[in-house]
Every structure is written in C-alpha cells, then in structure tokens.
Amino acid sequence: MRTRSTMRRRIARLASALSAFALAFGALAIAAPAQADVVNAEMPFKVSGNVQNQGKPVAGVTVTLTGAAGYTATVATDADGKFVAGVPAKEADYTVTLDETTLPEGIAVIDNPATTFVEANVQTVTVGPGGRATMNFFIGQGERHTTSFVDQVVQRLISGLNFGLMLALASVGLSLIYGTTGISNFAHAELVTFGAVATFGLVALMGPGLLWLAIPIALILSAGLGWGLDAALWAPLRRRGMGLVQLMIVSIGLSLGIRYTYQFFIGGSTEQLPGSDAERFKLFGSVTLSITDIVSMGLSVILIVAFALWLSRTKIGKATRAISDNPSLAASSGIDVDGVVRIVWIIGSVLAGFSGILWAYFRPGIRWDMGGQILLLIFAATTLGGLGTAYGALVGSLIVGVLVEGSSLFIPSDLKYVGALVILIGILLFRPQGILGRKERVG
Amino acid sequence: MDFLGILSSSVSFILAPTTLAYALATLGLAVHFGFGGLLNMGMAGFMALGAYGYAIGVLTFGLPWYLAAFVGIGAAIVFALILGIPTLRLRGDYLAIVTIAAAEIVRLLLLSSAFGGVTGSADGLSGFNGPGGTITNPAEGAGGFDQSNPIPAGTYGFPPFLDNERIWYLRIVGAIILGLAIFIVWRLVNSPWGRVIKGIREDEDAVRSLGKNVFAYKMQALIIGGVLGALGGLMLAFSTNVNSSVYVTSLTFFLWTALLLGGAATVFGPLAGSIIFWVLQAFLGLLFPALAEVGLMPFSTIQASQIKFIIVGFALVLLVVFRPQGLFGNKKELTFVK
Amino acid sequence: MSSSTSSSSPVKSTGLHVGAIKPGVAKKDPILVADGVRRQFGGLVAVEVEHVEIPRNAITALIGPNGAGKTTFFNLLTGFDQPNDGKWSFNGKSLAGVSAFKVARLGLIRTFQLTKALGLLTVMDNMKLGSTEQRGEKLSASLFPFLWKKKDAEIEDKALEILRRFKLDEKKDDFAASLSGGQRKLLEMARALMTNPELVMLDEPMAGVNPALTESLLEHILNLKQEGMTVLFVEHDMHMVRHIADWVIVMAEGKVVAEGAPDEVMKNPAVIDAYLGSHQDIDLGTVTGRVTLPTLPKEK
C-alpha cells in the first residue's frame, strides 16, 4: 500500500514538473508542430565555414553549395568572413564552390595541399551523422577559376523550365477545379504529395526495379483519391450550396488533416525515390543535366499536350470549358455539371500526383509536407495566368518556374520564393484576371 | 499509464502563456473575420512581427523591454498599412491568398541569412528577456522583461498550476493584456463603430451607399486585429525564444480552428476556442502516446503523438460543415457571408 | 392583377423642361447634370450619355431595354464605377472622381437592383446605419458610450418613426435576412431615408416585390416627392412608370434616345424602335403600358 502511494506521489510530482517544463520551454516546440511547412524546403543540417585572407576575414564572398540531384544554395560571408548554409540531408556529400569573382581584386583561393582537387575554389564536404560540416577557404595571391555568367544563366533557365513544367501539371488542375467549382483548393498541395508518397510506398512494396510500374499505379491511386474526395466531400457540399469562403476553409482543414496523415505514415524525414541520384552529364561549358531532368521534362510536355488535346477536342473537355465560362448557362444547356466536375477532380488529381512525383526528383526527396512547400507557387502560377483558365496556368507556371530559379542569380537563394510571392500579390492587385484572363464587367 | 497526470498536464494549459497568446491572436482574427469579414490568412505574419519586433528592439536597438514591445506593435501596424492600402478592395478569397503570401514573405525574410545579423536567421533570437543589452554590447543591459517581475523567486499555486514566479508573471501579464483586449473589443463591436464594421461584413457596397468610408473602417479593423496578433506574438516572445519556424502558415490555420471552435462573431469565443484547442491538443498529445506505450494503440509513440494534428484538420472541416457558428455562437448569426 | 390602378391618381409635376422636348433637353431647375459621360468595357461602349438633366423635386423614370446601360449609368453617377470620360454635377458640385461614400454624404443616395439588406444585422441596426450624425461611428469615440448613447436613442426614435410608416416596426429586432424580398426592398428604402437625402436613386424598386406590397411602395415613392426630395428610378414596369413618373428618360444602347412626360414619350417612335430593336417578340401594347411587361431576365 505504502509503496503504491509513494509511487503515485512521485508520478504526480513528475507530471507537474513535466507540465511546468512544457509551459516554460515547450511552448516553442508545441507552437511549432510543423516546421517551415510552406515554400522553403526544410534544411535542418548545416554546412558552415570561414573565408580568410592571410588570417583576416573576407566579407561578401559568394559561396554556392550543390548536393544530390539539384540541391543548390547560395550564401554570402558576413563581416567575420563566416558563411552558413542549410542542407537537406545528413550523411551526404556537398560541393562547396567559392565564387572568385566576388573576391577583392588580385587574390584567389590558394590551393589547399590537404585536398587533391585541382580547382581549389571547388571543394567537397561530407556532412556526417552529426548533421554539421565545416569548410574553410584560404585566400591569397593566385589565379582564379571562373564559371561564365552565360553558363550560369543557361543552367538556371533549364532548371527553371523543368521546375515550371512540374508546377504547370499541378496548376492546370488547380485552375480547372477553381474554374468549374470556384474552390480555392488548399488541399491541392496534398494531392501533389500523394503522387510521390504513393510511388514511394509502391516502390517499397514491389522493389525499386518496378518503378516504371509503380508510377502508373500511383497515378491510378491519385485518380481514385480525386474521385473519392469529390464523391465523399465536395459533391455533397456543392449540393448544400455552401459558400466559397466556407469551401476554402474546408479545404484548409482537409489539407492539414491529410498532410499530418502522411506524416503519420512516413514520418518527418526525407526519403528518396530510386534514380534520384542519377549522374549529371556535361552539356557544354559548366552546364550539366541529369537523365531524370530530361525524362521529367519530356513526360511533362507529353502530359500537358495530351491534356490540352483533351480540353480542346473531346466533348467533356469542351463541356469543362463551358462550365468555367458560365456554370448556370452550361447547366441549362443540358451539360451534366456534376459529372463533369467529378471528371475534373479526377484529372486534376492525376496531374497533381504526377507533378508530385517530379517534384520528388526535383527537390530532391519525399517529405510529408513537400506539396505544401510549393502550394503558394502553384497559386501564384494559377493567378498569374488568370484564375480558372487552364492555358493561362501553364504560361504562369513557366514564368514562375524560370523566375524562381533565375532570381537566385541575383538575390540570395533562400529568398528565391519571395520574388514569386511578390508577383502573386502584384497580379492580384493590378490585374486579377491574370495575363490571359478576361476582365469582368462591373455592375 | 498515468491518466491523472495526463489530465492534470492538459488542464494546466487553461492558464498557459501559449494559450493566452493564441487567445489574443484569435481575438484579432475575430475582429478581422468575425466582425469585419476580412479573410486574413496571414495572422502568423502579424504575430511574427510582434515577436521579432520586440526581440530586435531589445537586442539590436538596446531598448528597454516595454519600449521594445511597442516596436513589435508598431511593426504590425506598418504591416497592416502596407498590406491594407492596396488589398482591402480585393474580393474575399483574393484577400486570403494575398495575406497568406505576405505572411510567408515576412517569414522568409526573417529566415533568410541575408539579414542574419539582426534576425538570427534559422537559429532565431534568444536572450532578449534577460538582463541582456544588445548583441554588440551585452554589458549595458538595464534589465529586461524577466527583471521586471515583482514576484519573489519561488513556487506558487497548487497542482496542476504549481509553477515558479516566472510562469506566474507571464500568466498575470498575459491575463491582464487579454482582459483589456477583450474589454476593448467588446466595447468596440457593441458601439456604432461595430455596427458599421458588421454592416461592411454583410455588404460593403450597401454601407458605402450610406455614406460611410468603408476603406477607412476596414483599415481600422485590419490594424486593430493586427495589433492583437502582434500582442499574441509578443506574449510568445515573453515566454520563450523567437524562431521563424513557429510563424508558419499552419499557425494561422490553428488560430482559425480555435476561432471557429469558439465562434467567429463572439467576443469570448476566441478565448474559449483557444483553451479548448490547447487543452485538447495537450490531452491527445499525451494520451495517444501513453496508450501506444501500454500497447492499446497499434502505433509507435511518435506516430501516436501526431494523431492530434490529423484530428485538428478534420475537426476544422467538420466545424465548418456542421457548426459554422462555433460552439458558443448564435445559430442565427452565422458568420459566413454568402 | 395590376395593383396601382386602385390608388387615386397622383398629382404630376409639369412644365419641368425649357424649350422643345428632345433628348438632353434643359430643365428649369436641374438637380443633377451629366455631360459626355462615357463608360467602356473592353471594346463595348456601355454608356455614352451626351447630355442629360434631372429635374428637382420630381419623379423621373429611367427606362430602356435590357443592356441599355441604365444600371451602369447609375453606378457612374453615384461613384460606384468610374467613367472613361465625362463630367457630371450634383447641385452644381462636380462629382467627377468623388468616391461613392462622399457622393452619398452630399445627399445622393441610391438603392440596388439586387437588394442589399444587411442580412445578419437586425432591422433596427440596418436603420441606424443610415444615420449620418452618429459620432460614435468614429473609432476614437466608439469606446466611450457616454459620447454616443444619447444620440443613438434619438436615432432609434427617428428610425422607429420611419419603420412605422413602412410597417416594419414589428420586425425591428429581427435579422434582416428573415424578411421577405419585398420587405427588404422597403427596408432598403427606409434605410436610405435615414440619411436625409436630397436625391434618391432607386434601381428597379419593384423587381421581385410581392404585388401586395407594390402599392405601398408606390405611395412611399410619391411621399418622397411630397417631402421635397427628388427621385430617379429605373423600372421595367411601364404601368408604374406611367402612374407615378413626372418625367421619363429613355436609354438604348448606352445613349439617351428620348425624353418627355410619360404619356408622350410612350408614343415616341424612337422609344418603340428601341424596344422593338431588342425585343421583337414583345407586343407593342406592353411597351406602351396597357399590359404589364412579362418578367424580363435581369440586367447584370
């Protein structure tokens, strides 16, 4: 008896101590259930270092990091000559490149005898299990190694087109859904993630050799998800005549619910699909490309062309456009609006799912909130092209893609999404009908 | 499994500084959306400015804590003006996308290493509540928020509210700010000013046709709600470090959940909603892992601790569909404009 | 079915114009004058009014087929839309570039084709919003009830008096959303009266109103004139136009095509043309007002 009561007291004390702990220090952790869940990729690990000229710090030097399949970050050294960059994964290699054109005149990186590299301004670091790595550069009199600006522009342009095509797959779906139902669907991000997560699950089940089979099955599952969401949720709400604001908040709740369901199943870490470490080959100069980039862009173009043909040639595609133009007129002219909307949800989900698979290769990696990271870019692309116009969304996506990738030539790469968001706001303010949309008549 | 311990820890969230911070920001959302019809999806941005404004005021400008707090509030007012001047004429759902994007821009700027010297970049800021001084001159600190605490060191109260003097000070300061805020908002929405604001929520053209300067009223509502959001951020900063990873879009969505729980067009709903939100979050966050540990749930404890977020999301859906007026709102006074 | 025949014939104001009757004819005492007002949507010219004057203390009807630009013209005059070109003045004061709320404060109040009763406010709150004298609507004063309580009671008395006239006083504590369509129209008109307007512009006051209420609506409009106000209204119901209007202005394809006293203007070939041009299926009898027009699809 006695031991039990002491036990209980001890537990009570422990619990109150714990709750005090939660109050005092846990507030941050609890208030941040989702880490950086939108736009910017989570970079939990660090590469840092010093740039010194004969023991004195050199400020304002640009350092670029590149990693597995497409990760890049550009940072500048501070007044102490220090630079810090977040990287997505530990136990991985990163290439650290010091841009010698940003050094003061007449000096360059001294060849470090400890490394076997020919170009001293390009170094490789390994981020170990601790998640941190250091790379110091020593500057002195010497010869420079340069990457031509043209090469950089071409590289960014290719990368931007790739990114833009991927965005386009997601945004034409969002745009169609908005056009036919009026919903600003925040849960579209989760449809994007679904494609990647389903592929990942299927590959885990069937083995990496069957990736070619896993992707189509994942897309069929995406179609099923779109169908299911419309049948179970959106169609009933449509019949209730729910307002657009409510529908938007419903989609936000749905987005949170599904997102954390992914986290429940795959955890908080980043996983890779087979082939994400494909080798990069040299195109010309210092411009490189990988086989996944080429396949990704090729498949995007094929899908987008197929989608455009569907929209312009088939009966259902034409009906979709009619509903976007004027739902009540379309309904009164005998179009089965509910049926068409159901198909729009299915097609939108398949395109989003495929875009998610490509995003998994582009980022690279699969995460539970990967769709949320680009949701606002998808919104930006859709808005830029004109809300509810599918072709506009395509053009908008390409612009946003090139802009985001290209802007890192001029601004710090951790601010590259800001440009797209500023454009999103600007478009909504000054030309809400988008670049291809029509102006609504007032009154 | 210690069910009583879980219950007591959860109940302690009724008076937690975080709950008070949420209640303040949610009250701001109520002014924006519940009374003014402004679909603000960027409340996290206002909170971030409140918290960072205060921290930067102390650490970079070397201000005393109470003046630094006004830097945070001032930053939120400036943000409201910059955001409001061009956007307040936008349609509801456009405004939502603009505000969410603006809040993300704020977060990305705070996160960027470009301003790391002031914002602390990804590491955030800390040490601004202590005796501190600035980053460059730590010696000149005149005493910060913690030093203003008149409560002698020690442990007070009774379980589950048995806490040290710092926690109690936070609670008291938070409760006073929240109490004042609720009183002011109550006065405002029951005044002729509140009548105009509610009219604008219903149909701004009608109110305009009656000779009211709709834009000015919306701007006032945006600023008042934004200041309440900044106070919420300030409250978070008083209790812990600031970090840009806190002020994410999800935070705004959680505030919306708390708002719709309590009732969007009510004065006490935001407080009630925040309390329910946090007590339930804490309860489920402790209960499920405990159940998993003793084998009553077939998941790992980590998985079990995430179920609460899934529940939040689907609860938001169910609330909007089945009880849009919130738990305490008037069924007739549904807040959603068609 | 026509409801207005039962009421005694109202006294018409005559001799409003100066010189020969033609589109844009000058008025003896115009309250509102518009000159070269043009509004274009893309390539489509919605409104192009060369010159028009609205006579003071009279009831003027603005009629015309669908798409004639009547509502757009209303929006332009009241500051809810900006024209590409033109000038217009109210009581001699130019309204170009004046925002909608300031136009309203000058005494030019409008209602909307689709009623804008504030659904989730009570009928009384709707009325109180109309008052322009409440300083408690200022943010700084709103926090101190002693600054506005007394005025609010006065406003409430005035509102009750108007509500009684409109037979809405029993509904004063109901949400406006619970009223019928016709009652909402009445409420909107009553609310407009709370602002003490000089010129009341009604956009299709009869649309969607239960026949039982039309008579009282007509009487209220006639009362406005008796109280010294000026009324300009858009209407499709020709019967009503003939019954209460002192002057009729006809618009077609954005232009003023005819003006005159109701009986004369209905015989004007330009008017018959305008209507026939767009609604060839409509019997001329309906246009000249012997039969009530069928419900036409509403202008956007």
Model-derived features: positions:
Chain B
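Transmembrane alpha-helices and adjacent helix-loop boundaries
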Residues: 1-338
